[in-house]
């Protein structure tokens, strides 16, 4: 009975939050109110409000405010500072004419490609490869928004389609050595090499190709439906005085991430890399004019871009975190796990149930890790008791958690991309919905075809 009540409360609040965001209310305010309401109800029900890693203040009421403080410090510090630095960097690149020079140079070879959607798919594959270097979905999305997004928009790709491309690369896990894959390999009782390279990677590649095709047709359909015209920017209208080599500057963060990864050079945080990139750009600006005042005034544009990012993106991330914690503390995720364990032992049925519940948990909490970490702990027990191959259950769940995050209006990557693109999170979700569902279907079908469903088939007994 308690499980039903927790689920009901979670669903009611989720529906209410979605309704008011769709009606045009501030997403930050709505998520804050929804999250605080859930935390208050959790406290009344006797649930612990703060994560287990945080010490209680001694009172539930102040614990709620304490959690907001924790999020402000964590998301306003590490992740938030990264987002603000990237937004400031993007604003500075526009100010000094580097983005204009990228468009001016790129327009010459790109004019031979008539379809902006082919360019969009090429950008999607590049973005997916970038996920090998940047493990954070939000970090990757923000990095792509600061680098690829302006280029895509300026060569004729709609803002919604370009935002969807930046939000969806991390929907499928491609990196064989990510923490999720290592944990999944353990739960599947397989070596990392066999699980990551021989089993998961082929399924991931198939899903990425399917999602790319879906992006092509879905974005084109939505653009036609919304009467969005595609016009290449007339390069003759670009009057930038920046030298041609400035075209490389917007991509220096990506180059830095690839170089300073601990293999080719020292492993540096992306914020450190961004500081280096900003210093290089400002030094070049000084060498062009030898005008210190002009350089300092230009950097003010970057600082204002950082401030705008705090108001439009970082605070939205904090509000989304409060909402996700509210769903977690009220027992919403644990209730979903209880439902999963109540189903029978038929392999395909159990796999589909786990996939659906993992997707639902990821959509509602906005986290790709938390639902998978919560569900994966019970995989060995479920598999052994049912005679099912653990990998048969783990692989679809692993991908479903990340796919579900891309459909969540409170996930960091969707919120950050929507904020930087200045569109609604629901517009991003609409744009990614069909490609994500296509990817999910491919993952399920490929798992059914490539991974043995029973433990006996694996052991040969």
Q: Which residues does each PLM region occupy?
A:
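Membrane-interface alpha-helices at helix entry/exit sites of multi-pass transporters
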Residues: 104, 113-122, 153-166, 193-198, ...
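Hydrophobic alpha-helical transmembrane segments of multi-pass integral membrane proteins
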Residues: 82-85, 111-147, 316-320, 343-381, ...
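Core transmembrane alpha-helical segments of multi-pass membrane transporters/permeases
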Residues: 32, 52-100, 271, 275-334
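Short amphipathic alpha-helical coupling elements at transmembrane boundaries
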Residues: 70, 101-111, 150-154, 297-308, ...
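Membrane-interfacial loop-to-helix junctions in multi-pass transporters
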Residues: 3-7, 73-80, 108-122, 155-161, ...
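Alpha-helical transmembrane segments and, especially, the helix-loop junctions at the ends
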Residues: 127-144, 149, 154-194, 211-215, ...
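Interfacial loop-to-helix junctions that mark the boundaries of transmembrane helices
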Residues: 1-5, 22-24, 53-58, 65-78, ...
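Long, contiguous bundles of hydrophobic transmembrane helices that form the permeation core
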Residues: 2-14, 18, 31-38, 42, ...
């Amino acid at each position: 009975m308690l499980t039903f009540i927790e689920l009901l409360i979670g669903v009611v609040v989720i529906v209410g939050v979605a309704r008011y965001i769709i009606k045009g209310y501030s997403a930050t305010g709505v998520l804050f109110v929804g999250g605080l309401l859930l935390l208050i109800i959790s406290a009344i029900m006797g649930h612990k409000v703060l994560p287990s890693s945080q010490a209680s203040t001694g009172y539930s009421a102040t614990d709620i405010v304490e959690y907001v403080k924790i999020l402000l410090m964590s998301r306003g510090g590490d992740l938030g500072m990264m987002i603000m630095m990237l937004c400031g960097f993007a604003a500075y690149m526009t100010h000094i004419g580097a983005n204009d020079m990228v468009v001016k140079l790129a327009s010459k070879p790109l004019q031979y490609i008539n379809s902006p959607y082919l360019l969009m798919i090429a950008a999607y594959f590049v973005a997916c490869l970038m996920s090998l270097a940047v493990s954070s979905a939000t970090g990757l999305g923000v990095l792509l928004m600061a680098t690829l997004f302006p280029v895509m928009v300026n060569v004729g790709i709609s803002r919604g389609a370009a935002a969807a491309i930046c939000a969806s690369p991390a929907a499928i896990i491609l990196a064989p050595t990510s923490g999720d894959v290592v944990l999944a390999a353990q739960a599947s009782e397989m070596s990392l090499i066999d699980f990551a390279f021989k089993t998961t990677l082929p399924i991931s590649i198939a899903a990425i190709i399917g999602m790319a095709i879906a992006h092509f047709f879905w974005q084109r359909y939505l653009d036609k439906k919304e009467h969005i015209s595609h016009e290449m920017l007339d390069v003759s209208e670009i009057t930038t005085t920046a030298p041609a080599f400035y075209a490389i500057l917007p991509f220096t963060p990506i180059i830095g991430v690839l170089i300073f990864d601990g293999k080719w050079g020292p492993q540096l945080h992306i914020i450190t890399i961004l500081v280096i990139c900003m210093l290089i750009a400002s030094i070049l600006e000084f060498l062009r004019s030898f005008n210190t005042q002009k350089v300092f005034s230009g950097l003010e544009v970057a600082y204002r871009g950082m401030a705008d990012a705090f108001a439009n993106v970082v605070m939205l991330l904090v509000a989304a975190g409060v909402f996700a914690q509210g769903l977690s503390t009220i027992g919403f995720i644990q209730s979903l796990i209880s439902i999963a364990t109540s189903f029978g032992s038929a392999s395909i049925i159990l796999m589909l149930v786990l996939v659906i519940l993992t997707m639902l948990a990821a959509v509602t909490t906005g986290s790709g890790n938390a639902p998978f970490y919560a569900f994966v702990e019970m995989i060995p027990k479920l598999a052994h008791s049912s005679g099912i191959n653990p990998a048969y259950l783990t692989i679809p769940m692993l991908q479903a958690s990340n796919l579900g995050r891309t459909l969540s209006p409170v996930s960091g990557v969707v919120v950050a991309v929507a904020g930087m693109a200045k569109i609604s999170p629901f517009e991003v979700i609409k744009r990614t919905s069909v490609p994500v569902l296509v990817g999910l279907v491919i993952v399920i079908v490929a798992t059914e075809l490539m991974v043995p469903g029973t433990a006996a088939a694996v052991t040969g007994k």
